[in-house]
Amino acid sequence: MSKTDVSGLSQLGRQVDAPTSPETAVLERVPNTNAGTDYVVRFTAPEFTSLCPMTGQPDFAHIVIDYIPGDFLVESKSLKLFMTSFRNHGSFHEDCSIYIAKRLVDLLDPKWLRIGAYWYPRGGIPIDVFWQTGEVPKGVWLPDQGVPTYRGRG
């Protein structure tokens, strides 16, 4: 097993303040030492929070990000800090969800990426947002995201 070069990272192994906005959050990447192999990386954020841009009230989501890396992997501490940066950020559910996915695509240029953002109800209506870069490459095992649609007490 080869060792990953982490010399260019600015956050891993250091105490870092949470970014004040998603736009200023620094996402970092590391080389993928298995770049010749297609495999799925999954990140799950079951307690994602942001703010409603109209009321300032908190919004909550269970977010699942799956991607097939190319030459790079997202460094997980930077992803955690990026996701945390939404806590005081006002934006609609759709905007948050797609922004997260596109920032990762811009950073990583993955072979494939999808996001499932399962937002908890506000005003009685749950909003789920799904986006992916294209068809899943053949031969890749892609498990279900495992988040049931919202049923309330039903």
From Swiss-Prot:
Example GO molecular function: preQ1 synthase activity
Enzyme class: oxidoreductase
Positions with biased composition (Polar residues): 1-13
Residues the record marks as active site: C52 (thioimide intermediate), D59 (proton donor)
GO CC terms, sorted: cytoplasm
Pathway assigned in UniProt: tRNA modification; tRNA-queuosine biosynthesis
Domain of life of the source: Bacteria
Coiled coil: none
Subcellular location as annotated: Cytoplasm
Any matching Pfam family: QueF
Gene3D superfamilies hit by this protein: 3.30.1130.10
Region described as Disordered: spans on this chain: 1-24
GO biological process terms held by the UniProt record: queuosine biosynthetic process; tRNA modification
E.C. code: 1.7.1.13
Reaction(s) this enzyme catalyzes, per UniProt: 7-aminomethyl-7-carbaguanine + 2 NADP(+) = 7-cyano-7-deazaguanine + 2 NADPH + 3 H(+)
UniProtKB keywords: Cytoplasm, NADP, Oxidoreductase, Queuosine biosynthesis
Binding site for substrate: V74, E75, S76, H93, E94
Family: Belongs to the GTP cyclohydrolase I family. QueF type 1 subfamily.
Function in brief: Catalyzes the NADPH-dependent reduction of 7-cyano-7-deazaguanine (preQ0) to 7-aminomethyl-7-deazaguanine (preQ1).
Protein name: NADPH-dependent 7-cyano-7-deazaguanine reductase
Origin species: Allorhizobium ampelinum (strain ATCC BAA-846 / DSM 112012 / S4) (Agrobacterium vitis (strain S4))
Gene: queF
